[in-house]
């Protein structure tokens, strides 16, 4: 009986911690800094970005929605992320993309880090995001440390212009 109670209690604690994690990450996030591989074409790097909206769909799934302009057209992108067994790790597009969501000591900041198997190669991209668009030096320093740990160059960090969301034509 004690074993059953312990199992149920641990399961409930795990479920509650997952719910808290989902609540922490949902909402609107402003992109403060980005980094991509050196191989990523300069002309394809996003210079203007909209806020990212993260929604919890239940069952360990999150949806990230954002918009961007391409050839004078507003494009809306939705990415369905499925939680993996590793805390903070999600997969998308049938496992082709792996995303790591890391909360920073400043609770209002996260690092979204993505590995994308694209055209036979592996692309790495990182975003420092916050609940508001204000600059935070501590969060930026943490982002720089992650960039170095992942083997990316601090010189490749750039700050895109924060824009409002555009409205796609349907």
Curated annotation (Swiss-Prot):
GO terms under cellular component: extracellular space
Q: Which InterPro entries match?
A: Calycin, Lipocalin, Lipocln_cytosolic_FA-bd_dom, von_Ebner_gland
Q: Which GO biological-process labels does this protein carry? A: chemosensory behavior; sensory perception of smell
Can you name one GO molecular function term for this protein?
Answer: small molecule binding
The listed locations are: Secreted
Its job: Probably binds and transports small hydrophobic volatile molecules.
Instruction: Specify the signal sequence span.
Output: 1-15
Q: Which Pfam family, an example, fits this chain? A: Lipocalin
Q: Which family does it belong to?
A: Belongs to the calycin superfamily. Lipocalin family.
Instruction: Report whether Transport shows up as a keyword of the record.
Output: yes
Q: Which cysteines are joined by disulfide bonds?
A: 74-166
The entry's protein name is: Odorant-binding protein 2b
What keywords appear on the UniProt entry? Disulfide bond, Olfaction, Secreted, Sensory transduction, Signal, Transport
Quote the tissue specificity entry.
Answer: Strongly expressed in genital sphere organs such as the prostate and mammary glands.
């Amino acid at each position: 009986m004690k074993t059953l109670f312990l199992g149920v209690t641990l399961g409930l604690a795990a479920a509650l911690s997952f719910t808290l994690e989902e609540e922490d990450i949902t909402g609107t996030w402003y992109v403060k800094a980005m980094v991509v591989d050196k191989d990523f074409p300069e002309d394809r790097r996003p210079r203007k970005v909209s806020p990212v909206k993260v929604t919890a769909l239940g069952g360990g799934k999150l949806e990230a929605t954002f918009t961007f302009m391409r050839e004078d057209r507003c494009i809306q992108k939705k990415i369905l992320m499925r939680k993996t067994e590793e805390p903070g790790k999600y997969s998308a597009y049938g496992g082709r993309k792996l995303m790591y969501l890391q909360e920073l000591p400043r609770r209002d900041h996260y690092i979204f880090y993505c590995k994308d198997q694209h055209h036979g190669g592996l692309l790495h991209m990182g975003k420092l995001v916050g609940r508001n668009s204000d600059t935070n030096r501590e969060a930026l320093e943490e982002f720089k440390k992650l960039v170095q740990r992942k083997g990316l160059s601090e010189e490749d960090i750039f700050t895109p212009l924060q824009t409002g969301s555009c409205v796609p034509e349907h």
